[in-house]
Amino acid sequence: MLNRDAIRSGAFLESFSHLPPEILWTQAQIAQSLADTMAKRPAGEEVWVFGYGSLMWNPLSHFDQRAYATLHGWRRSFCIRLFGGRGTPQRPGRMLALERGGDTQGVVLRLDTATLEEELHILWTREMLTGAYTPAWTTVTLATGKTRHALAFVANTCPHQYEADSSPATVARAIAQAHGPLGSNAEYVFQLRQALADCAMTDAYVEEVAQALEGFETTS
């Protein structure tokens, strides 16, 4: 179960202990990534986080403002091989990230300043377990036209997990057969599709992957 208690107790980290050391980050590496990223934080700015995947429906970190936003220059991509959570080393799934090109609609969350240190710890433990992402300070555009600096976790194209082929047909085949302690990989895709619909948003790429998965279910 992915929740605050699991992260605080260490149970979430423990559920990934089967991963090889070249993939699983240590707590020291996670803490260093957080420190390095916050050292680049825009001066005097509150911390906003851009959610484009499960942060849209299960943010875990406490926030005091939420708004719809668009991140220009980045697109959703199931380009990360998933060895834990909703996949295994034997049957890896695909994890969502952002790659260059296009635009992405999502939400921005302003982390609660009163508990900012804890919220960031929870966020980094959740997102940076394997170093599959690169935390980046970006600029998002709100529905009002205003802009905000926001953290976005984009694909790290260097580690073992990155896959260049993230076409809907390719990723759907991997996602269809992947399961793990957090459930099926396909369930994630359908939850993402619903979260987008709940925000009156669409993503053609996500829809293609979801439809391909439905095709597998129909023929199985």
Stretch-by-stretch model annotation:
Residues 1-220:
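A glycine-rich, hydrophobic/aromatic-adjacent loop/helix-cap motif
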